[in-house]
Every structure is written in structure tokens, then in C-alpha cells.
């Protein structure tokens, strides 16, 4: 997780350096608001930053970032191989998905814990929680279409404001 305000180093250059050394490591940019992102002189690409999140004062955004990365990395294996369900979120605003994801993850964990039997062992509870629905985030029509095709049998819901880019046009 990279902050915008790093002394003597812009976050894009820092993210690019990390990606050169560790190409598969996710790099997340955490900004205080959209104006910080607009002040960055270089265009943000996947070669430097995987996703931008906005800090709104709620520490649960960190848990959401970690779960988002876990779901992104494990989605294919868990959904296809283990028949785990998924929720597709189509949202192009970092501020919006930074607020929605913590809420969704909290609710999913709450519901899974509610369904758990009280007499399960700790290892069984952990296994049960790992089987929670995965959350798939995309920011545009093409990404949503790709994910729907790939996981169509396992998508249990789609959350969207129905206002997102298609062919880079909003």
C-alpha cells in the first residue's frame, strides 16, 4: 500500500520500481481524496499501480484492500475449482468502491458466521470462512463482461450504479 505523500518520491515511480522487481506483487495507491490523484503528473497504469483506494477515515478500508487482493488472486481457483460463489461489483469511482467494499466484506463475514454451527472446531470455522463468496471488482463494461463470461455459473449478484465506462466512454 503506497500513500501519495511519500517524501522525495512520487507514488507512481515507487510503484513502477516495485513492479520491476516483483511483477506479481499488487501495489495499491491509498489517497486521501481524488484531488491528490489528479495532482500526480504521470498517468497511472498497471505497470505501477493495480488499484486506487480513497481513505475516508474508516480503518476497515485496509481490511477491504487485503480481502480484495486475496479475492483477485484466488478467484479463478476458488470459484472454478471449488465452486465458490461470487459477487460482481462494477464501479469506476475509487471513492465509491472504497466505501462500499468494507461494508460488503463485513456483511459477508457476518452472514457466514451467522450460518456457522456453534460446535465447529477452529479449523472448521476457518475453512467455512474461506468458502465465503468472493467479491470481484471491475471498473468498466468490458471487465464486467469478461468476468460474467468466466464465472457466469457462480455469480450470485451484481452491484452497480449502471454508470461505468464502455470502450473508455462513460
Predicted regions and their residues:
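Non-catalytic signal-transmission and effector/linker regions of two-component phosphorelay proteins
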Residues: 1, 42-134, 141-142, 149, ...
